[in-house]
């Protein structure tokens, strides 16, 4: 902490010190409560010091403590905290004014408290005056401040307990609301999940419906293609059938032509065979003729010889050869005639071959056409089967589609209803959640208000508790002062008892001297009374015997044998009244000595203390003990006895000098002492009784 003049921070927005008392008791620790404004960041280097009011520098502190840094802070809210100053470091009591000052780590004063003093408590500070709440009476009650503070502390504690119970109830309600919100959120999540699953199912059904629709469209297109193909094939089949019919007609015509050509060829073949048979026969005949010619040549050769012989035969043969030549010519002519037939046959054969080839080609074309027709018919049959299958499948798909449409429409209606129900449920849940969130927000706000009030009440309770502790400390200090005063009174009591013992000794001495003097005077008067007894009767009331005290002592207990005339019970609440004057009974004769007058002075002092009935008697009579009681009661009893009997007699009862209550003479002395102790201030009971 560097030394620097006090730089006062502005009071607005600065540190605010709470419940600063005007006076503090020394030798007791002091608790300082303060509030940091919103936005202030507390630091461990900040400190709170006790300064004199006129201090102008931060180094002029009397003592200081480091500020406490809270663990958790809320942005935008003030910070309440406190520190304690130990009793050993506090200033000494006096009239000097002090104040708390908050100094930050830069050495700037951020706030200061009202001035206060350190001084010992005064006796009157312990009492406070209370007025009646209704104002119906003018009675003022004077009660100890500790009682009032204790009542206020009890009320604050009760209010704090009520607030804590209310806080616990609110926390329980908030917990229930949170659990309800969590259940609703879980239900909403489940509903959303179910809605998502239903939407996924709906999307799956939509996709399957789209796929089925696409497949149906594809099948419809395929069916259209197949129908178009079937129509094309039917047109092709019809065209091919027409072509086949045309080819069949042409083939039939060609067959007829082939048949005619075949018949003609057969005829030609028959003719050719006949011609060939004739040719072969002619050739055979030619060969036979050639052989015969050869034979003839041989025969000619033979016949040359035999020419002559056979010239005729040769002529014949020549004729026969000529005939044969004519036959051969005819055969050749016939062969020549057969050449056109051969050509015609060859042409017919070629035409038959070409017709056969054409028929073969037509047969092949017809076979290919038949195969194409069969193939087309088979393809048509297969197409018809496929179309039938496709139609069956389309019918099945149509039925399935209708069923799917029905089911889909039902599911869609159900899904729409469930979606609507879920939407309504979600809207209700959303409204419920909004309402619950609003209620939770209100509860949080109210809880925050309650927390703020509770914190404020806690701070005020802590401050009141601190004040109560301080008041209790003051009361303890006052109690110590009273104990010291009581010890002083005990010492004074001991001194008074010592003085009473001395006085008792002096009174015994004076009584003995007076008794001796009275005995001497009696003897002298008895001697004189023998001569004039009548004169004694006239002055009988004036004789010293009438005023002579009976034998007494400070520890006298009285003679037994008599019962009380009418004892009364002592009231616990007794008003001290002035007792009957005792001094007339104690007046002695005019011829008492100086010692007698001195004893009378001592007794007069004691009787005056009793007659005053004031605060001095209340304080002194209990300490005087049994000596004064015995003396006072002895005087009373003796005087009354002498008055009634005309001479000294044994007292039959004792009387309280304050309330005139009588006790038997044989009763214990402690009973009278306890009775008289009940009249005075210092007793075993509580000196104050408050309602």
Curated annotation (Swiss-Prot):
One of its GO terms (molecular function) is chromatin binding. The modification Phosphoserine is found at residue 4. CDD domains: Zn-C2H2_CALCOCO1. Residues 45-125 are annotated as: Interaction with GATA1. PROSITE patterns: ZF_UBZ1. A zinc finger (UBZ1-type) spans 653-679. InterPro entries: CALCOCO1-like, CALCOCO1/2_Zn_UBZ1, SKICH, UBA_autophagy_assoc_protein. The C-terminal activation region (AD) is used for downstream signaling. Seems to be essential for coactivator function with nuclear receptors and with the aryl hydrocarbon receptor. Functions as a coactivator for aryl hydrocarbon and nuclear receptors (NR). Recruited to promoters through its contact with the N-terminal basic helix-loop-helix-Per-Arnt-Sim (PAS) domain of transcription factors or coactivators, such as NCOA2. During ER-activation acts synergistically in combination with other NCOA2-binding proteins, such as EP300, CREBBP and CARM1. Involved in the transcriptional activation of target genes in the Wnt/CTNNB1 pathway. Functions as a secondary coactivator in LEF1-mediated transcriptional activation via its interaction with CTNNB1. Seems to enhance inorganic pyrophosphatase thus activating phosphogluomutase (PMG). Probably functions as a component of the calphoglin complex, which is involved in linking cellular metabolism (phosphate and glucose metabolism) with other core functions including protein synthesis and degradation, calcium signaling and cell growth. This is Calcium-binding and coiled-coil domain-containing protein 1. It comes from Homo sapiens. The lineage of its organism: Eukaryota, Metazoa, Chordata, Craniata, Vertebrata.
